[in-house]
């Protein structure tokens, strides 16, 4: 007769922990899949662009967001944005400010990094490259999908933070420095996590990667 070996208390606890971890991982996977169920993911390699050197690919939890940059509108701001993209500075950076159906904001390189998020200071961080001047002289229509650099309440304080609007905002013209526009994948941004009672998000979604189509 084979003698049954009774599991110790610690072994039972470990077993229960493993089961709970598996259930949590399984449910989290399907929660993400469900959130993104009807969002089309665009493959930039299957799209022909007129100006491929000015195409940026923002990868977020629900897929790719393809942005066309406008150096003719704001040359210094676009150059700063490209510089940070090429250094992979935006990877794993939080969408720290999200207003439902209005805008998403990211780019706090100092206090918005995954694994080192500082809730007390997020939104105030810098890139280390210094501020650049506002570029608002060229007429620009801030329609849905427009991308602009964020700033403080003062002009000429743009740095690394940027926002993308999810609806038309005509009053933003001459107020913010535009750098481009989303041409594919805006729906993926509408799935970025937000809170109903606050612009600032606890346990936020993150930028997975942000790359230029052509380096």
Summary of predicted features, one role per range:
Residues 1-215:
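Cyclophilin-like peptidyl-prolyl cis-trans isomerases
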